[in-house]
A protein has these predicted regions:
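Short, cationic low-complexity segments
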Residues: 54, 161-179, 261-281
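Non-heme Fe(II)/2-oxoglutarate
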Residues: 225-293
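Conserved double-stranded beta-helix
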Residues: 88-162
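Generic recognition of flexible, low-complexity loop/linker segments
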Residues: 129, 207-209, 227-231
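Short, solvent-exposed loop/turn segments at secondary-structure junctions
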Residues: 32-33, 114, 147-148, 161-162, ...
Length: 293
């Protein structure tokens, strides 16, 4: 059963176990989460020089939007303050900083009504993160920078929890993605030509769920959940933040969520850094985790 829990009184070990069972965790805005959102808003305002960045797509050509959004996303990811703010969030959430690792945080920019659906504004089709070579032990943290409405959020498909769906993950290799796919994001025009892993059969939307969150409200879910960018018909660009965490203890024990239909190659584990000092995951842990993805 895919339960939704709001601000649960759980230890971090208990929280991870619930997420590995397919549950969703919602966190109310806290000072560290609000600080991360404020940091992102400052960068967004600087990039677009606009009092209302959510509607800027209506005032500039898409080529200019790409030229502004691409560097913005890179600055957010690589800014040392971004990583420090993520660490503050993990401290408040009860994570052990010596055994918790997180990957580079990302600022997502999802425009409205087909203005930009590729490259830096890619609207993700239904997928599991494990299809992109993520480990079963990965947990996803997702929060909007501005308040959302139903036509501006994510779609979750909990009916596929532990149930396979035909997909093209066997054609995905993470090393190739790093070499070609990610670096070519700003070169994508109206059609995204990168090799994304996708369903090869129709997704049953009978159990679709959408979380309509306020700014800094945060959704936690397993990397094994099937999810997608909901079609944005709001007239407003959606800005959101996501990052992923793993516990070294889970990699060692083999703990994680079901992974019923993943055939991707490679591993994202080398992207993760330790929360305490931002050092990379040791190679022996990468090898151990990769064998279990």
């Amino acid at each position: 059963m895919n339960l939704v829990r709001l601000n649960p009184a759980l230890t971090n070990d208990e929280l991870r176990a619930k997420l590995f069972d397919g549950e969703f965790i919602l966190l109310s805005p806290t000072k560290p989460l609000q600080a991360l959102v404020a940091h992102a808003r400052g960068m967004i305002s600087g990039a677009f020089s606009d009092q209302d960045p959510c509607s800027v797509q209506h005032r500039i050509p898409v080529e200019e939007f790409i030229q502004r959004a691409g560097p913005l996303k890179s600055r957010f990811t690589n800014d040392p303050k971004t990583k420090e703010l993520i660490r503050d969030i993990l401290v408040e959430s009860g994570c052990d900083l010596n055994s918790t690792y997180f990957d580079v945080p990302r600022l997502r920019v999802v425009s409205s009504d087909g203005y930009l659906v590729s490259g830096v504004g890619y609207a993700y089709k239904a997928h599991r993160d494990t299809w992109y070579s993520s480990p079963r032990a990965q947990l996803n943290w997702w929060l909007p920078v501005f308040d959302l409405i139903p036509s501006q959020t994510m779609s979750m498909y909990p009916g596929y929890w532990n149930n396979p769906i035909g997909n093209s993950s066997a054609d995905f290799d993470y090393d190739e993605w790093i070499r070609v796919g990610r670096t070519n994001a700003t070169k994508q025009g109206s059609v995204d030509t990168r090799k994304h892993p996708l369903p090869v059969e129709k997704v049953d939307s009978a159990t679709e769920m959408r979380f309509v969150l306020k700014a800094a409200e945060t959704l936690l879910f397993s990397a094994s959940h099937l999810h997608a960018t909901a079609p944005n018909s709001s007239g407003q660009t959606r800005f959101s933040i996501d990052f992923r965490t793993i516990s070294l203890d889970d990699l060692k024990s083999g703990a994680g969520a079901p992974d019923p239909d993943n055939a991707s190659q490679g591993t994202t584990l080398r992207d993760f850094i330790r929360a305490s000092d931002f050092q990379p995951l040791p190679e022996d842990a990468v090898a151990m985790g990769a064998r279990r993805t």
